[in-house]
């Protein structure tokens, strides 16, 4: 629901959502979104899947340059002509990231984008997202149930309660990067969030 509101697919019952100075009332190119599954077109190559994300009118040369730039950005140079079935799960998600970024959105929304990946690929993709964030400097909003992932990636964590969904806490993560998951402050933040979810589960809310 939160991501639908931000992207303009749903409307708040009160208040406003703004991206920059624009009040969000409908979907726009300001926001790109990455889902839990890559959702690529199986009959299209990597190049064509990324190209499919372009909705702006561009000249042919600029279009080619933009596509190649984003394929290179996600580390898939040399795989331009590969089909999704020829790629690993992590590589498929890289294609979806390139497709979401190719329109140059101001905000990138990530809806549990690594939930379907194995543990090692998930960690590698978290590092990849940080690398892309450092290169692109986009605002990224990540929805995740993985506490370590939230601490590792985020500058700020918003902890939501369930039914009804409310903001329980906002935690600033003032840790230098790259972050050590075994570090004292990392563990302290993890414990704090764990305690909330444990209390929430015991309370039945």
Where does each model-flagged region fall?
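Helix-to-loop junction immediately C-terminal to a conserved catalytic motif
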Residues: 7
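Short helical segment in ABC ATPase nucleotide-binding domains corresponding to the A-loop/adjacent helical element
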Residues: 47-55, 64, 68, 172
């Amino acid at each position: 629901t939160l991501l639908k509101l931000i992207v303009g697919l749903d409307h708040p019952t009160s208040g406003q959502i703004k991206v920059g100075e624009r009040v969000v009332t409908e979907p726009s190119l300001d926001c790109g979104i990455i889902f839990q599954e890559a959702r690529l077109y199986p009959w299209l190559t990597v190049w064509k899947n990324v190209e499919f994300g372009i909705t702006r009118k561009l000249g042919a040369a600029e279009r080619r340059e933009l596509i190649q730039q984003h394929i290179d950005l996600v580390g898939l140079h040399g795989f331009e002509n590969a089909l999704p079935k020829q790629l690993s799960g992590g590589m498929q998600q890289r294609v979806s990231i390139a497709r979401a970024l190719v329109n140059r959105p101001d905000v990138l929304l990530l809806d549990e984008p690594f939930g379907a990946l194995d543990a090692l690929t998930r960690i590698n993709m978290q590092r990849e997202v940080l690398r892309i964030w450092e290169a692109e400097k986009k605002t990224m909003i990540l929805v995740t149930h993985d506490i370590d992932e939230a601490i590792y990636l985020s500058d700020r964590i918003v902890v939501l309660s369930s039914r009804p969904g409310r903001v329980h806490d906002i935690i600033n993560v003032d840790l230098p990067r790259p972050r050590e998951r075994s570090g004292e402050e990392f563990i302290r933040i993890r414990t704090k969030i764990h305690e909330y979810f444990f209390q929430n589960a015991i309370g039945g809310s």
